[in-house]
Each structure stands twice: as structure tokens, then as C-alpha cells.
Amino acid sequence: MAKLTKRARLIREKVEATKSYDINEAVALLKELATAKFLESVDVAVNLGVDPRKSDQNVRGATVLPHGTGRDVRVAVFTQGANAEAAKEAGAELVGMDELAAQIKAGEMNFDVVIASPDAMRVVGMLGQILGPRGLMPNPKTGTVTPNVAEAVKNAKAGQVRYRNDKNGIIHTTIGKVDFEPAQLKENLEALLGALKKAKPAAAKGVFIKKVSISTTMGAGVAVDQGTLEDAK
């Protein structure tokens, strides 16, 4: 507990809760405060000007970050025939149909992303109660239900992040690791915000990107001045 108390005290001393920081200053603060004994992720929370109670204002999608996320992503693909070979060549760890579904039903879930070709959804659909709660259910909006499974595998491996606003209208995702260069984290964040702006629902009125905060896995959030980000202006 002493270490947690010391870290909490340091955060209080260094981070002004009501201040929005220049992106470079915010990243420098995160790096200074990242004292965990493991390599922490850099996470982002984006408050959107949407009413999540209305289906036409929910935001969901995916984008490939220019510098990836720093994670090794294991991919499972539901497909068959030529698509199965293409998925394997693209780097998918697990490829199959009914036999892959049987593995998942048996509790074997050694993967981070699930991709499916449209003809495989008859099999994947039966796994909704298993994959859905884990956020793994393939969906056309995130590019994980597609006839071009090879491209989807490559995107997942290249550092694609999926996003979906929660019940409070906030997007939570990862933009890298704390050992990334500041410029890499900035460019990843700008790429995410650019994708979010393109995904703005027509029904959403007023300011769309209301607040942007970044944090490490074990750290406090640091608000970012959007004026210092290219794609948030």
C-alpha cells in the first residue's frame, strides 16, 4: 500500500485536475509517472457529444494506428477454402469453421481478435453468448466481418484499434505503450481522433469531441489541450 500511496501523492503533486495540457507535456507527465514494474499501456478516453441512449448517435468502428499499439495480437479467423489459405498467409494463428467453434465452446480462447467472412457467420452466430460479452464478436462496422479476411488480419496485426462509445458517450481505447516516442503517441492519438471525426453521426449536434484524456494503465488521467492536436482542431 505504501507504494500506491506514494504514487498517488506524486500524481496529485504533478497533475492539475482542472488543467488541459499540451500533448507533449501530457505525454512527458505520463512517462514520469509510469512507475509500475511492467510496461504500461497508454490509454485514451474521448468524451463525445452524443446521446448514447439514441441508436443513431452511437459511434462504433476501427482504425489502424500509424505506429501500432505495441501489442502482439493473436487472430482467429472463421472462413474456408481459398480465404482460409489467405488468412493463414496473412498471419492468422487460428483458422477454421466448425472445429474452431468447438474449440471456443470448450473454453480454448487463445486469441485477441476474431474475424469472419460473411459465409462463416452461420457458425459464428452460435457463439454470440461467448464472444459477445468479451467484445470479440465480429461486426461489419469494425471491419471484422468481411470477404477480404486477409486484409482484416493484416490490419489487426498492424495495430488496428476498435472503438465503441460506452453508456456515457465515452470512447476508451489504447494508443501505444509508455516506451513509445512522444511523437508516435501524438500521431497515434491524432489518427484515432481523425477516425472518430469521420464517424460522427449525422444526428450528433454541437461539439463532437468534448474532452480528450490520456493515462497509463496504473496512472491518473491527464486532460489534453485539443488545440495541440492536428486532427482535433
From Swiss-Prot:
GO terms for molecular function: rRNA binding; structural constituent of ribosome; tRNA binding. Keywords: Repressor, Ribonucleoprotein, Ribosomal protein, RNA-binding, rRNA-binding, Translation regulation, tRNA-binding. It comes from the Bacteria. InterPro entries: Ribosom_uL1_bac-type (IPR005878), Ribosomal_uL1 (IPR002143), Ribosomal_uL1-like (IPR023674), Ribosomal_uL1/biogenesis (IPR028364), Ribosomal_uL1_3-a/b-sand (IPR016095), Ribosomal_uL1_CS (IPR023673). GO terms for biological process: regulation of translation; translation. One of its GO terms (cellular component) is cytosolic large ribosomal subunit. The keyword Iron does not apply. Binds directly to 23S rRNA. The L1 stalk is quite mobile in the ribosome, and is involved in E site tRNA release. HAMAP family: Ribosomal_uL1_B (MF_01318_B). Part of the 50S ribosomal subunit. This is Large ribosomal subunit protein uL1. It comes from Shewanella halifaxensis (strain HAW-EB4).
